[in-house]
């Protein structure tokens, strides 16, 4: 099952209530604390990391620079600096720190 982190949290609850926990591979998108914890404990198979705090910080810096200097920063993709292209797995989950609770 693939979906946003919040949806995968619901799938975890539904599978658990149905007595089918662990019967599906769960892959989220967002990099929430719930996702990172789920990948760590094996409840989730993987997650595609999102970095909303980092993105917001970079955006604000670029905006202030543009206002002060009139210079555009161009496209900024914080995902290019993420380990393993942002794919969180059991093998690399320790490289990621959630930026939101989810």
Predicted regions and their residues:
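Short beta-strand elements at the ligand-binding edges of bilobed clamshell
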Residues: 41-53
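Short, charged, surface-exposed secondary-structure boundary motifs
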Residues: 35-39, 56-59
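Structural detector of well-ordered beta-strand residues that form the stable sheet scaffold
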Residues: 25-27, 45, 88
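Hinge/cleft segment of the Venus flytrap/periplasmic-binding protein
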Residues: 51-102
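Sec-exported extracytoplasmic/periplasmic mature domains
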Residues: 12-20, 40-44, 64-68
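Hydrophobic alpha-helical
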Residues: 1-37
